[in-house]
Amino acid sequence: MAIRTRLGDLLRPLNSEYGKVAPGWGTTPLMAVFMALFAVFLLIILQIYNKSLLLEDINVSWESLSF
């Protein structure tokens, strides 16, 4: 038997949705699409940083940022 405490009574509303799951896949496919797009974004940033993605007429050195 669980012991009832004042803190537990205060926190109970935060746990009222425990075990309730929406039927089906929900928004999982949408989340997968955004994760894939984010992975592609990170790969592009990494390739630009490593200079393995060649960009014509775009200088990616730190000197180009100075005035």
Swiss-Prot record:
It is a single-pass membrane protein. It holds the Pfam family PsbH. The keyword Phosphoprotein does not apply. Keywords: Membrane, Photosynthesis, Photosystem II, Thylakoid, Transmembrane, Transmembrane helix. It is found in: Cellular thylakoid membrane. Its main location: membrane. The chain crosses the membrane at residues 29-49. The keyword Membrane applies. One of its GO terms (cellular component) is plasma membrane-derived thylakoid membrane. One of its GO terms (molecular function) is phosphate ion binding. InterPro entries: PSII_PsbH (IPR001056), PSII_PsbH_sf (IPR036863). GO terms for biological process: photosynthesis; protein stabilization. PSII is composed of 1 copy each of membrane proteins PsbA, PsbB, PsbC, PsbD, PsbE, PsbF, PsbH, PsbI, PsbJ, PsbK, PsbL, PsbM, PsbT, PsbX, PsbY, PsbZ, Psb30/Ycf12, peripheral proteins PsbO, CyanoQ (PsbQ), PsbU, PsbV and a large number of cofactors. It forms dimeric complexes. NCBIfam families: PRK02624.1 (NF002728). One of the components of the core complex of photosystem II (PSII), required for its stability and/or assembly. PSII is a light-driven water:plastoquinone oxidoreductase that uses light energy to abstract electrons from H(2)O, generating O(2) and a proton gradient subsequently used for ATP formation. It consists of a core antenna complex that captures photons, and an electron transfer chain that converts photonic excitation into a charge separation. Belongs to the PsbH family. This is Photosystem II reaction center protein H. It comes from Synechococcus sp. (strain JA-2-3B'a(2-13)).
